[in-house]
Amino acid sequence: MKTPEVLVVDDFLEQEAWDRLLNQVQCDEWTQSQPDDKYWHITDGANYKASKRFLRDAPFNDNYDIWADAIRAFADSEPAQEYVAGYTDIAMRCHGYPVGSKNPWHTDMGGVTYSYYLHKHWQINWDSMLLVLPKDSVEYKQMMRKLPGTKQQDTYAGTGTLEMFEQAEKQKGLIEHGMGYFVAPKPNRLVLINKNVVHGITRVDKDAGENVRLTITGFFNFFKAQVVNV
């Protein structure tokens, strides 16, 4: 599927490559996202992330080289170049969303990003759907406006910060428009999300049980001096 907002590719990896990559991420260093990581709000539930890597540092001499080769080949392909022409680097990190976790509405700070669904099994009623609003359908600014005298102390000091508590006004336009489409977290599916696309991820339902929504995600960087470190 190709739209102005997303490019979706199913059966992205061969079975052996998929198996080896899933095996590799289980040997990474993992941490739980903290409240200071304002991409997730306090009420969004616990989620987990592995260590981050960048394509520029490949080869890694482990099974992440499988992903580095695959995402580079994809980015250089004709379908993807419409979205990522001129990229200079690609970030890669595994995220885990267990039952009760979600990701709120955002625009990835206006950047081009991707998500690859690494988990082996998923049911449609387990939710954790990617929700997408049509481009330019709403006016939405991800960064919080700082009032006079406010000094930023968090890890987003170089880029601006995001609201922790006052989100209702920002989200008013989303509910007023109230229409879009979803992309299910189908195993072995890659989704490229275009720049300035408003999107969110619904909560993992309790029906998922012990199953965790696993993704390899990252930004495409376009400037030699720019490294989007999220």
What do the PLM-derived regions correspond to, one by one?
Residues 1-80, 102:
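Non-heme Fe(II)/2-oxoglutarate
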Residues 86-230:
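Catalytic core of non-heme Fe(II) oxygenases with the double-stranded beta-helix
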